Structure formats: structure tokens, C-alpha cells
């Protein structure tokens, strides 16, 4: 994706661009590529660096050909006059003449997310100017006697902003479906609870990757993919992430589809056949038709999170302040 962004700015074939792994010898310390931030954040930085290189090249070519730099077009691996397209040179020639005029061409780009306008406690955590959205429909077939089920078909729609490479984007979306299906159906690490020298420790019940199941071609369903393009002004050429987003709705969709089919809830991942069978047995015995952690002392503890904060949007006249945030006492410095 970074190569495609740079290629689009400079008007050259992305296959001729080499993207190397950066390190702190060449670049400043970066927070990382987690949370599907490469296309948006690194993409914006790459675009800025490419635009600076294009500006320098335009100046060099403009002086060489006697053409105003603002009239030059970068396309089809050439740099040419917008008014007289035949007047120009190849991109390689543009690099040579610019280096002869200004020396080695080296430009940098950076990107910092905009500061969050939120003034309430925790409002500045993990700011991002844009987010992707996904929606999915999962079809399941469940055996009401055994709890064994299969997923024959999944429909997945993902708002990508703009697809910089449609084929790769669809592959990413379907890869997210694959990952989500693995988490929903079978991926699990089972531990033994042991005490050693007074310390409570956990060890794998079956320490083998053979027992960490993932979907194969036999388990993968038919996937109908919808790439929803709504360009985002904050992304490079309007693009947003297409990495982790598509996997998120798969797990709740599988659980909801099973409930719709046989009327039982499984409230923990993976939604294995054994858990569905246990929930079916509980339902048949007249008990709660569910399987999952209880709300008792050994289950999920109840946590009082308090009232939700209420923040008016800018168009409602808000300034980022939560009008119902509890006041915090200031402690005197010692």
C-alpha cells in the first residue's frame, strides 16, 4: 500500500518502488504498526515525503526545460508540461537532472494524529481521525441433538474509505473473516490450574500447536464481500484501514446465528460444539439456555462503571467537556 501511495504521487509504477523496514538508525522512534494504523498513519507520512520529492523534482525539471514547476504533470513514469505533453522527460531523466542541480534527493515525511478536542478524563487516549466500519451476516446449520454446526456462507461489508488496491483489499477482508471464524469456532488455549511451592501457576493442558485448531479449506465458508467506498478526508487518497476491522463482527454474528437457529446462548469464545451441546442440554432440562461464565463469586465480577459521560458534539455547542463528569478533589502538594 505504501508503494502504491508513493507511486500515485510521483506518477511511477509501484513495482519500481522498494519499501524497506525502518529502524531507529534512519527514523525517529515510532509507536508501531498495531491497531491497523499503517495505511492511515504511515500512508500519510509516505505521501508527505513523496510530495516533497515531487516538489523538488518539479523545480529541477522546470529549470531544465524552462517550464513553471506548477505546470508540470507526473504520470506514466514521465514528467511533462500540462499544456504541451510532448515537452518533458522520463522520470529517470528527471531524477538525474535534479540530482545534478541539487545533489542527492532525500525527503522525509511524518504524521501525527490531530489532538483530541475532548477535555474529560480519558478523552485523549488513542486518538484517531477516522475509523472503519464493518457489518456481517452469518448463516449457520446446527444439529439440535449434538450441537455440531457448520457455517456455509458469510456476507461481509467493510467501509474502507477508498480501496487503493481493490484485489488486495478484498483479500484482507476475507482474511479477517478467516481469523474471526477461527476465534469464533475453535481457537483456544486450555490451561491446568496448579499450585507450585505455594504459588498458583497455569500450564498448558496439551502443549502442542496441533491442538490449537484453525479453519482449513474444508471449514471455510463461501464469502460474499462488499467493499464500501466512502473516502475519508483524513486518509491518504481517502483510504482507511482494512486489517483487523473485518474480523470483529464475526464472533458475535456466529453466536447470534446459533441462538437464532436453536435458541441457546454461548457467552464465551470459542463457541465450540461441546459448549453448544451443553447449552442445549441445559435448555432441555428446563434450566437457562446458555453456556458461559456465571455472575457468581467464581464467575465474572460485577463492576459499577457509573453513569455514562454526556458530551455535546461541536454542532450542539459542545466544547469537548462532559457536563456530568464528577468533580475530582485536588490534593495539596506536599
Task: Give the label of every model feature segment.
Residues 1:
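Flexible, small-/acidic-enriched active-site or ligand-binding loops
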Residues 4-334:
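C-terminal catalytic domains of large/alpha subunits in multi-subunit enzymes
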Amino acid at each position: 500500500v505504501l508503494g502504491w501511495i508513493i507511486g500515485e504521487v510521483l506518477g511511477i509504477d509501484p513495482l519500481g518502488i522498494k519499501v524497506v523496514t525502518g529502524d531507529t538508525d534512519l527514523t525517529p522512534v515510532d509507536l508501531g504498526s498495531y491497531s491497523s494504523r499503517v495505511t492511515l498513519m504511515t500512508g500519510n507520512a509516505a505521501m508527505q515525503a513523496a510530495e516533497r520529492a515531487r516538489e523538488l523534482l518539479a523545480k529541477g525539471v522546470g529549470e531544465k526545460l524552462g517550464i513553471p514547476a506548477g505546470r508540470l504533470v507526473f504520470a506514466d513514469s514521465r514528467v511533462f508540461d500540462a499544456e504541451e505533453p510532448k515537452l518533458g522527460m522520463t522520470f529517470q531523466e528527471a531524477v538525474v537532472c535534479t540530482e545534478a542541480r541539487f545533489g542527492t534527493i532525500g525527503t522525509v515525511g511524518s504524521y501525527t494524529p490531530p489532538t483530541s478536542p475532548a477535555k474529560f478524563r480519558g478523552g485523549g487516549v488513542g486518538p484517531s481521525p477516522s475509523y472503519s466500519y464493518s457489518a456481517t451476516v452469518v448463516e449457520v446449520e446446527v444439529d439440535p441433538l449434538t450441537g455440531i454446526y457448520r457455517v456455509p456462507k458469510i456476507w461481509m461489508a467493510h467501509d474502507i474509505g477508498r480501496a487503493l488496491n481493490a484485489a488486495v483489499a478484498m483479500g484482507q477482508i476475507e482474511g479477517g473473516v478467516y481469523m474471526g471464524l477461527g476465534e469464533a469456532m475453535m481457537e483456544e488455549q486450555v490451561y491446568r490450574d496448579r499450585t507450585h511451592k505455594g504459588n498458583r501457576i497455569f500450564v498448558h493442558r496439551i502443549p502442542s500447536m496441533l491442538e490449537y485448531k484453525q479453519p482449513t479449506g474444508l471449514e471455510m465458508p463461501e464469502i460474499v464481500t462488499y467493499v464500501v467506498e466512502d473516502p475519508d478526508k483524513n486518509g491518504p487518497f481517502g483510504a482507511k484501514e482494512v486489517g483487523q476491522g473485518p474480523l470483529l463482527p464475526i464472533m458475535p454474528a456466529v453466536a447470534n446465528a446459533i441462538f437464532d437457529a436453536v435458541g441457546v446462548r454461548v457467552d464465551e469464545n470459542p463457541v465450540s460444539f461441546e459448549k453448544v451441546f451443553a447449552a442445549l442440554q441445559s435448555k432441555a432440562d428446563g434450566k437457562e439456555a446458555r453456556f458461559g461464565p456465571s455472575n457468581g463469586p467464581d464467575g465474572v465480577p460485577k463492576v459499577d462503571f457509573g453513569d455514562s459521560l454526556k458530551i455535546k458534539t461541536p454542532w450542539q455547542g459542545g466544547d469537548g467537556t462532559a457536563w456530568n463528569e464528577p468533580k475530582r478533589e485536588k490534593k495539596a502538594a506536599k
